[in-house]
Amino acid sequence: MAIERNDISDPAFESVIFQYLQDFGFAPERRGDLVHLSGVGVGSGDNSVDIALNLVEMDGHRILEVSSELRAPGVSFEKAMTIAAQGNLSCVTAKFTPVENLEQGNHSVRAGQVLYADHLSGDELKAMLYLFIKEVDAIDNVLVDMLIN
C-alpha cells in the first residue's frame, strides 16, 4: 500500500519554525501555509537560493518538506531530467527532481529535502537547513547555466 501524502496546516508548529528561522538570522515570510526564505546562501555561494518549507502528514507522521526551485526558464523534460541527474550526482542532502509546469508546457528543476518533524529540534533544523542551503547555493548557478545553454 502506498503512503498517502496530505498537506496539513498546524499554526502552532509553523509559528515555532518561523521563530527558529528568525533566531537563525533569516527573514522568513508566510505565504499561505508555507514559510519562505528568499535569497539565502552559505559559504562561497551567491545567496541565490529561495526556499519554501511545507508541513505535510504521511502515515500519521509530520514531515517538513524543504524545497528550492532553480531560478531558470522552463525547459524540455529531457533537459530537466539531465539537470536533475547532475544535481543528484553532486549533492548528498539535496535531491533534485524535474517539475512539470502544465500551464507553460515545460519543466523546471526543484531541489528538495524532507525532515521528520514529529520531534524536530531547533538545532536539528538549523544543521539540516545549513547543509541544504550550502549544497544548493554551491551548485545552482552551474545547473542554471546548463539549463539555459
Describe the residue ranges of each PLM region.
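Ordered, soluble secondary-structure elements with a strong preference for glycine-centered loop motifs
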Residues: 7, 11, 78, 119-126
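Well-ordered alpha/beta subsegment
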Residues: 93-130, 144-148
